[in-house]
Amino acid sequence: MPGPQGAGGAPAMNLGKLSPVGWVSSSQGKKRLTADMISPPLGDFRHTMHVGRGGDVFGDTSFLSNHGGGSGSTHRSPRGFLAKKLQLVRRVGAPPRRMASPPAPSPAPPAISPIIKNAISLPQLNQAAYDSLVVGKLSFDRSPASSTDGHSAYGLDSGFCTISRLPRPEKPRDRDRDSSFPAEPELRRSDSLLSFRLDLDLGPSLLTELLGAMSLSEGSAAETPAPAPAASPPASVANPPAPASSPSLRGRCPNGVTTRLGPVAEARASVVGEGPRAPADEGPGKHRGAVSGGSQSRHHYTEVDARAEGLGALSQARASWGSLDEEWGASQAGSRTPVPSTVQANTFEFADAEEDDEVKV
């Protein structure tokens, strides 16, 4: 079984130093500690074991117990590891000691300890692994320029590495500092939300439509043209249907039949005898105007116009029917339906009032 130094021509390790008996019995076995044998402070890292470059081992070395191809037991004490090495020394034989001559200086140790190099439980940290880690920040400590052989005693070459941690008070500060930058855009976003207005157009309301219909009815009543004068009988004779189509004779036909203006207007329409009785109808109109009060006061102008239109239509009807009697003859006059010579002005007045009341409701 090869020694701990391997069979690659490396200088043989003095296994006598591994025995605590050799340290006590040999006066020259005492070895001074040097700077390269003690690691520098590593922060939170606990220095629980030490493996020197010359083979000095102390501390918890249980992770090295299965090194060397032994049994598969993973839990071995350092004493068992040292006892195994002592048995190997007894079999091979220890080199003779030279008591007279001073001890020769030990050869230069290798750059990387073979025990640490071949330890399978130690992680190998490199720059690629550092880039992939997010939780912690890894940094490798280089050895100071104390070694004279040009090789660093610690660091990547010696296998020692340091996982440095940020102090706990610094982490919240960094978070607060990082979180303070996006605070300004958030305030801007809130200002834009406060200045945002939502305007919805739901169309015209029912009240707007009612007011529009009432204004149209009032405008049409005010824009009604004045009736033609009664002193134009030739024009009415030349064109007999003109009185029926005129807006002043709304609701009447040449044969004397009155069109339906509504249930109320139809019930109030009646046929009266000849003779101007328009002044007799002014009483009911005035009475209805007095009863209606302020709601019918705005229709006063419409009622006056209706009365004037009724008087004008009466004169035109007399002239038109007189000319028709002369043209058609006595035979046609006998079969013709009697036509009233008087038009009640209040009929149109009540019809307009009822239409306005229906719009108001």
UniProtKB/Swiss-Prot annotation:
| Residue(s) carrying Phosphothreonine | T34
| Membrane topology annotation | Peripheral membrane protein
Omega-N-methylarginine is found on R53
List UniProt keywords, sorted A-Z. Answer: Cell shape, Cytoplasm, Cytoskeleton, Membrane, Methylation, Phosphoprotein, Repeat
- InterPro entries associated with the record: Cdc42_effect-like (IPR029273), Cdc42_Effector_BORG/CEP (IPR051296), CRIB_dom (IPR000095)
Record PTM Phosphoserine, positions in chain: 19, 27, 39, 65, 73, 77, 101, 113, 121, 139, 180, 190, 192, 195, 270, 320, 323
Where are the stretches annotated Disordered? 1-29, 161-186, 218-300, 320-361
Repeats (sequence): which ranges?
Answer: 220-226, 229-235, 236-242, 243-249
User: What is the name listed in the Swiss-Prot or TrEMBL entry for this protein?
Assistant: Cdc42 effector protein 1
Say which species the protein is native to: Bos taurus (Bovine)
